[in-house]
Every structure is written in C-alpha cells, then in structure tokens.
Amino acid sequence: MEEPKKVTKSRRRPMLVCVNCRKRKSKCDRQLPCSKCIQHGDTDTCTYLNDVPIGKKNNVPNTQVTPNSSSPSIVINLHQNGNDYKTKNLNGQDNTLLKEINNNIWGRNSPIFPDSSDHSPPTQVFGDGPNLKPKVIGHCRYSGENQYINMVPKGYLIEVKRSSVTRYAMWTSTSVEYRDPYLSCMLMFKKGAVKATTEQMKKKMKFKNLPNSFALFTAFDNADDGKDKPNLNHAKIFNKFAEYRQQKSIGDLSEDHILDTKDLPRRQAVENCVLMFAKFHLCPLLPLFNLPHLMEEVKIFYDNVEKTGKVSTKNGDNWIYCIILLLTKICKLAICMSNIPGDDVSPIAQLDTTRFIPLVHKYIMNHNLFRKCTLHQLQVLLLLRFYNWCAPEDGDGQQGQQNSILMGMIISSAKELGIGWDLFTPGFPVGIDISDGSRPSAQHMNAEEYTTLYQKIWCYILFWDRKMLLVNGQNCIIQRSRDTDYSLLEATFSKEDGSEFFRYFIHLDSLLLEINDLISSNPTKVNITALNNCMTSLEEEFRNIHTIVNSREILQSNDDPRFFEVSWNIKIARACILHAEVVSYEKECDFVRCHYAIQKLWEIVLSMCSDCMEYWSQRSEAFLGSLNNFYTNRIVEIAADRLVHFVKAIILRLHRFHNVKAEDKQILVQFMHKFCSLYFTNFGREYFRCFKSLFNLKMDYRVLSYSSVKDPWTVMLTFILHEMSYGEQPEGKLSLRDRLPLIAKLHDKLSYMPSSFKNHDLILDAWQTSIYPICRYDEHFQLNLYISEIKKLDEHYKIDKDKNLFESFYNNEVKLFGEEFGTQESCNSAFQKDSSEPPQETITLDEWGTLSGPYEGNDILLASETDSKALRYNDQLIQEIFNPKDFLPFL
C-alpha cells in the first residue's frame, strides 16, 4: 500500500515586492522607498503591489479623518491639549518641574532624542498630565505618498555689496526672512522706516556717516548722571569691536621678513604653556597634529630664529610661525572666555595677540597657496577655519556662512596632498616618498604616521563640510561618501587622544550626504517625506552613538563639546525644515499639514529656547567644561539668532488663530524680550556679529509690542501698501514688489479704491480671503502655545536690569549732542574735529513731540508739507511705534 505523501506546511511569511526593482523584502525591512530605488534614483516611482503595513518599528500616530481636508487620504489627529504630556528621563523616572522646562530631550540629564516606538522627531514635552505621550508625535507618514515642498519660494537671495557678493544659503537667518512673507514684510517695514527717518535726521547733522556716528553712543554712557554702570558702557563696547578692524593694516611683508620680537611669543611660554594647554584642551577638538612631531618642529623653529633673527620662508619656518600664532591665539581665547585663574595659564592670558591674525593672513596671501601646498600650510588653513568659527570678531560673516571660499581652498589643498576617501579603502596602496629637507621629515614622521594623520585630517575636513549643511543648509563641497568599517579606524581614532568622536561621525556621513542631495538637487521641489525620514534616521543613529559612548568610562558624550555641537546642529536643521514646511504648506493652502508643522515648529522652538536660557544661566559654572565655552558658544549663538526669527514668525501669525487671546500675544512678546535680554547680555559684549543684530531686534520688539494697541501684521500691511503707492524705489535694488510679491498682489487688488489703504479691516480681509487663503482654515485650529510653561520660564530666569544690554538702550535717557556735547572740548573729544569748527547744536532727543533744537515740532516727520497726505500717514505711524533714539544706530 502506497504511503500517502506528507504535506509540508508552507511558511506564511509575508513578502513584499517593489514593482520597480522586484527586490523581495522580508517583513522586518519595509522601507519606502526601498534601498534599491534610492540607490538608482527611482524614489518617486517606488511602489509595492500592496500597501506597506507599518510594523512595530514604524507606528502611525493616532489618526482621525479631517472632513475639510483638501487631501482626503491624509488623516491626522492634531493634539489640542498641552496637558497630555509627561516628561521622563533616560531611566524612565519623572523629572522635576525645572527639568521639565529647562532640560529638554537633548538636555544633559535626558536622552538626546526621545525613546519612542515610532521614532518621532524631537519635541519638547511639558506639563504634569496623566497621559504618557501626546496623541501625535513624529512626522506624518503619508501611506507611501511622497510629499514635496518648495524651500526657496522666491529663489536664492544674492546680495551685491561694494566689498563682496553673497548668495545666502537656504537656512540662514537672512534666507528665513526672505522666504517667509511675514518676516519679509517686517524687514521691509523696518527698512522703510529707517531709511525715511534717518534721511531727514542726517540733514540736520554735521557728521553723517559711520564710523563717526558711532560716537553718538557715548551719549548713552553719560545718560545716568553720577551712576557708575560699567556693564552698560556702550562706548567701550564699540571701541573693543573697533580694535578688530584697526589691526588689519600692518604693512606689507617682505620675502625675508625681519622678525618683530613683540609678535613672537616667548619660547618658554609656548613650550611650557601653549603646547601643554593645546595637548589637553585643543587637540581633541583639532585632530590635525602628531603632537611629538609638532613639539619637535617648534623646537627647530625657535633654534633657527635664535640663530638668524629672522623667519625663513625657504625652509618652511614661516608656517610653523603661523601655527604658533594661531595656537596661542586660540588658547588665549579659550582661557579668557572661561575666566580661569591660576599661575599655570597666566602667561598665555597676558600675551598680546592683537597682531597675530593679520600676520597669518599676510603670510597666507604672500605665498603660492593657489598652486601648491604642504602639510603645514594645510594645518594653518584648518586652524584659521577653526579660529574664524570661535572668534568674537566677524570671521565667518554675520550669517556664519562666509566660509565656503576658505573651505574650498582647504578641500582642494587636501586633495592635492593625497588626502581623501581612498585612505579608508582596505588594502588601498598609498606610496609616500618623503624627500630630504621636507617638513615633517622622515626622521620625525614615517609613511605610516603620515597616513594616520592624513585620515584624521580628512575626517576633520569632512566634519566641517557636513556641519555647515546642518547649520545653514549650505551645499556640501565634498560630494562623495563611503561606508567605512568601525574596526578599521580603531587604530587611527583612539580614546586616549580624544579623536574617537570622528570615528563615529564618519558613520553618519552617508545620511548627511543624502540630506544634502535632497535639499540641494532641486530646492524648489524637495521630497519632504524622504527628508524627514533621513532626519529621523540621523537622529536615531546619533542617539545610538550617544548611548555607546556614554556606556564607556573614558568619554562621556554629555561632557564632550563635539557631541553637544552636533546635537544642536540637528535641532537647528529640524527647526529650519519645519519652518520651510510651514511656508510651503501655507502657499499651497494645505492647512492640515500646515497646522501640524506650525505646532511642531513652536514646540521645538520653545524647547530650544529653554535650552539656550539654561546654557546662559550655567555659563559661570562648569557646564560642559568651562574651557569649552569658547567653542560651544558659537553654535548656541547661531541657534539663538535663528530662534528669534522663528518666534517673530509665530507671533505675526497669531492673529489667524482665534483661540489665541490678546494677553497670550503679550506673553509671547514678553517672552521674546526676556530671551533677547539673556541673549545679548551674555553674548552682546563678546561677539561683534551678535552686537550688530541687537539694534534690529530692538526695533522688532517695538513693532511686536505695538500689538497691545493694534495687530502688528495689519499695521505693517498698511505701511507697505502706502510705500508701494507713494514711496520712491531706488535703482539697482530689489523693489518692494519684487521682495514682497504677495503684498504686491494685495496692492493691485486694492488700488482701485485708494481710501481702502487706511481701512485695516478691509486690508486684512482681502489678505486672508484672496492673497493668503490659508488664513480661512485657521479659525478652528487650536494652537497650543504652552502659556503656563512660558510663564514658568520667565519666572525662573531672572536678569539684573542694570546688566541688561538689550534693555539699557531704551531705559537710559538719550541726550544726542546734549549738554555733554555742547562745549568745544566735548565736541573735539567725541568727534576729533579741528577746534576751529563751531560746536554742534544742543538736542534733547526724547519723544517725537517734545523735540528741541534743529528738530522742532513736526520737522522730524518724514514727509514735507508738500508731500501726499497718504504718505504722511506712514510718518504718523512710525511716530506711534518707535522712539527717535531707535534710529540712532542706523545714522
């Protein structure tokens, strides 16, 4: 009898097949788009035969159908109540109230990113509600649909000046203002008010242009008679920043420049203090040197100088000289910003380094860096790049992006030296032939040591290139990446010298380059779905690295300034992406996604603001190691500048949300005032670029605080409409219509009835219904502003009014050319003019209506009696909002 065949039970393992590449994928790996399509650039057409079921790793947030959605397939449940949050730290324990507000998800005592099942993007969690997590966290997943946004709706902004031409990267503060219609309108409103007012004021003044007008601010220092407030001495601040420019002109250097002994630090100070300080505090941040070799080179350099009395350019001593100058300058910067006392560091702090950077610039430009390069020359360029980032002067430009030319030179020089990705290829042969007389010589560094140092330098260059992508959205210069095995780099990046961080950073490079390709290949059509997925993956990978490093005793990432910096870089990038989403969805009238994005934007902005305030409150303590403040300050400064713009953008949109009360707006404006006070009081006296932005932000605060009387957005719309009708447009510059195309459409719509330019209700109604229809869908959206948490922040962080730099220019009585300037001696001392010139007239500049001197009565008004009455309306509006002294910095 024939035995029945055994029926083999088939395995019911769900399989998915991509219709593009037919690559089979198991249920544990169901990305969309799949990796093959990403590799071949077919992400738009990557679809599966069946909908991709979202597994445990990719949970979809709780959803509900939005009946009025223009995209019925999108289902999102927006959280309405801020009490649905509960904060937990890394161990799952509830935080105290202070940690809830101050230590956000990237805080020192909490995970860098939240440990959630759906791998949500960062969000600040507040309150003591009973629920464990909000109803919606993480970016929307659109059931396989790729969503696109326009990150440059008005294109790139290219600014042409006498000294330079700059194309602003898409995430800089200038680009944020240029992209956002609300911030653009506010910017042009300020420019119009400043231009018209200062033109009239200059006609009454004898000295009209910078830098003489800086002397005007000595009036602030004399405002409080008999009061000693050294912290508010604005003239000293100006003089301090003026020194940066005074030292630029030091004369030409000859081929054999005779060494000026006062420019070269003493040998004992360099060998015993500078190099020892650099070994323990700078080398982990600057993996550019083989330290024993550097010490030997410094010894040879001083021996040569003591013999000849000159810096030789034949044997490369000039580049060792530049390395010594830059290391000394950076060491002194680190010490001065940490205020560390002690005899071991006092020789460095007492060195006069004012001429060091100009000397380095002269040496760089006087040699053939455009044709050939050496290892020491490349090290000088990288040290200069590092210094420009940390320095208090305006090294990288106001937006921190004027570094591409130097980075291009660095990357090109590195490739000329053979430094690149090929060094990380296993088994790739590298033949290094070290000639006699070269520096470093074969006696001090063999070929293997050269290769190891080359690998470190390439990782450091890569770190800078990718960092500026996250900070400013700059296009990466290095357009290649390579997956590298961790084990192959253990010998190069050791824990002992502190370079282990760069071994981990290489692991993130492919993700960073993918983010770069998504935003740079076509900024007008960015796949935001793929971009958010990449950002989430980047956060997860960085969280894993954070966990790995924290599990070791040698290095704690919470105390490492590089981990601190990268976490802030990711937060800045997240906020900039969310802001771009808000602007794009508003333009497309996609109110569902817009509401979600604006809520998430405000949450991450509030979270980062609390981080900044906590950082400033802890600056005097050993937060992140006080010697690292000179390095970490820079990323916090950039974040604070960006956050102020985002806060302004949110405040200007509050009129659209009916659940927001008038007192809530005022709370946000006061929160902005507190944030700016901490920002400028901590950084305004140290960083020139921060100090320059103070005056613009003070005018912003004036405009926003005017909301207690009228809505600032309506007021600005009215002003711009009048300017378009009656104002003069300068030749060669972008006109108001070019900068504000949406308001130009509004102007065309209302131009048939000029009287409507004064009807605020009609203007706002036309804007919301015809020009910006997204406003019609906002009245039922409940924007959670976290008012109670903002109040807690305001109560917790106090600032002494006597030390408040942001507020001092308002509180002091301004006496421009007053009694202090009424005598011949004061005129001579303030303006350095010849004694034969008569003294300037006395002016008391307090309020518009109580002016004396040349500005009698209404003479300060912008338009003359013969001008249009409609334009005169703008004059009255400016007088209602601003104080005359607000315009002094712009004279």
UniProtKB/Swiss-Prot annotation:
Subcellular location: Cytoplasm; Nucleus; Mitochondrion
GO MF annotation terms: DNA-binding transcription factor activity, RNA polymerase II-specific; RNA polymerase II cis-regulatory region sequence-specific DNA binding; zinc ion binding
Keywords annotated in UniProt: Cytoplasm, DNA-binding, Metal-binding, Mitochondrion, Nucleus, Repressor, Transcription, Transcription regulation, Zinc
SUPFAM superfamilies: Zn2/Cys6 DNA-binding domain (SSF57701)
GO cellular component, one term: mitochondrion
GO BP term, example: negative regulation of transcription by RNA polymerase II
Gene3D superfamilies found in the cross-reference section: Zn(2)-C6 fungal-type DNA-binding domain
Stated family: Belongs to the OAF3 family.
Protein task: Transcriptional inhibitor with a significantly increased number of target genes in response to oleate.
UniProt name for this protein: Oleate activated transcription factor 3
Encoding gene (name): OAF3
